[in-house]
């Protein structure tokens, strides 16, 4: 018999210690990876519920198993809240991840070998937008577009490439681009050549939900997102559309199940429902505006200290620090900052002479620090410490000093108070 007082600490102390150590790491490290965030205890409560026991292949009202009357309620709540949040007429909350949501879109709209226009990974795109090591690059004919010398998307060049290659689908969205994307312009180009416009808004979904970044849903045929990152929900994916095209919706549903997945993760879908409800609250808008304010404050200090920011600034939650010309690789910067309890990720920058495993840049994002309460003053102070380390990355004394400052700041702003 299963008993409610069963726990990991007594049964599996080795695993429990790893979990405890990760909890401590999150409290004592400053998280600047742009794709990471802290989810709420309410979301974690949903994910730890008995919903994890339930198989529910199919969709609400059309399941292949019995006993789904309550998980139908859960999934319907998630669907309706997602639609409300983004102004969609269709939502599929079953994808296990953003990448699986993206693969479902490819499966629904394309055939292997079809031509796709996607943002170059080296210019800020994502693996699933056509990288040769990803399914998207292996199964489809990918034509990349990129950014100009100013670090902004070149829509004239995009249009020229689109007219020349006539892709069946154009992809908007990014994993490392700090500007505003003109979704309407992309739809205009797509319509000129009769292509689908697919937008992956994973990185900026929270900003979009709060109205501080343009919403692609009214412009794209289909939109995907993760539910973590700026949305601050559980790790997972979602597909949205406002195309009012029932045939398209059927294709998307079929591509998720049975096309790419079996049973949905009902405990995670419950977590998504909670996160969408949280994102509909007024304070979520305040949070997202602060995310952008903090990012702009950090850019200001980087520029003052002589560091180059790709595109010269940011209009969202992230920035790319360009280290080309400095005697410091992205990998070295990542490691040095990590030693001071500041977590970033090395990242390729445009025209990067180094490999993706070494890189000449670091990507920095503000969702997590804002979630724990940092405002502009703390963001600027932190950026100064980062610059101190980048200026002298091989100096243990500098790293140790900054680490002490980081620990003191983290103690003032606990993640879970």
UniProtKB/Swiss-Prot annotation:
Pathway entry: One-carbon metabolism; tetrahydrofolate interconversion; Amino-acid biosynthesis; glycine biosynthesis; glycine from L-serine: step 1/1
Reaction(s) the record says it catalyses: (6R)-5,10-methylene-5,6,7,8-tetrahydrofolate + glycine + H2O = (6S)-5,6,7,8-tetrahydrofolate + L-serine
Localization per Swiss-Prot or TrEMBL: Cytoplasm
Residue positions binding (6S)-5,6,7,8-tetrahydrofolate: 121, 125-127, 355-357
Domain of life: Bacteria
EC supergroup of this enzyme: transferase
Molecular function in Gene Ontology: glycine hydroxymethyltransferase activity; pyridoxal phosphate binding
Modification N6-(pyridoxal phosphate)lysine occurs at: 229
GO biological process: glycine biosynthetic process from serine; tetrahydrofolate interconversion
Family of this protein: Belongs to the SHMT family.
NCBIfam families referenced in this protein's UniProt entry, alphabetically: PRK00011.1
Name assigned to this protein: Serine hydroxymethyltransferase
Lineage start: Bacteria, Pseudomonadati, Pseudomonadota, Gammaproteobacteria, Alteromonadales
Gene transcribed to yield this protein: glyA
């Amino acid at each position: 018999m299963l008993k409610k007082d069963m726990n990991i600490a007594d049964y599996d102390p080795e695993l429990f210690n790893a979990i405890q150590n990760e909890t401590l790491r999150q409290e004592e490290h400053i998280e600047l990876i742009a794709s990471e965030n802290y989810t709420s205890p309410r979301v974690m409560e949903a994910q730890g519920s008995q919903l994890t026991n339930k198989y529910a292949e199919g969709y609400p009202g059309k399941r292949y198993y019995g006993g789904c009357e309550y998980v139908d309620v859960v999934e319907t709540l998630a669907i309706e809240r997602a639609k409300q949040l983004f102004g969609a007429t269709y939502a599929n909350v079953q994808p296990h991840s953003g990448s699986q949501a993206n693969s479902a879109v490819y499966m629904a709209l394309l055939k292997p070998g079809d031509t796709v226009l996607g943002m170059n990974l080296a210019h800020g795109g994502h693996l699933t937008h056509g990288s040769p090591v990803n399914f998207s690059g292996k199964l489809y004919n990918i034509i990349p577009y990129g950014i100009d010398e100013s670090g902004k998307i070149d829509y004239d060049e995009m249009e020229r490439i689109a007219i020349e290659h006539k892709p069946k689908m154009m992809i908007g969205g990014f994993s490392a681009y700090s500007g505003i994307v003109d979704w309407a312009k992309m739809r205009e180009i797509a319509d000129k050549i009769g292509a689908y416009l697919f937008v992956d808004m994973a990185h900026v979904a929270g900003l979009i939900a709060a109205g501080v970044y343009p919403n692609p849903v009214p412009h794209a045929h289909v939109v995907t997102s993760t539910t973590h990152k700026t949305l601050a929900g559980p790790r997972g994916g979602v597909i949205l559309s406002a195309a009012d095209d029932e045939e398209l919706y059927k294709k998307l549903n079929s591509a998720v199940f049975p096309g790419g997945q079996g049973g949905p993760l009902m405990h995670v879908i419950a977590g998504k429902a909670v996160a969408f409800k949280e994102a509909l609250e007024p304070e979520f808008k305040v949070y997202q505006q602060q995310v952008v304010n903090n990012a702009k404050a950090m850019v200001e200090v980087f520029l003052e200290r002589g560091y180059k920011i790709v595109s010269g600034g940011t209009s969202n939650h992230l920035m790319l620090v360009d280290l080309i010309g400095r005697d410091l690789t992205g990998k070295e910067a990542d490691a040095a900052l990590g030693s001071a309890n500041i977590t970033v990720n090395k990242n390729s920058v445009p025209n990067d002479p180094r490999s993706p495993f070494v890189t000449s840049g670091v990507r920095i994002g503000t969702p997590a620090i804002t979630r724990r309460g940092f405002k502009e003053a703390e963001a600027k102070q932190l950026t100064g410490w980062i610059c101190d380390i980048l200026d002298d990355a091989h100096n243990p004394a500098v790293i140790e000093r900054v680490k002490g400052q980081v620990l003191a700041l983290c103690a003032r702003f606990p993640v879970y108070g």
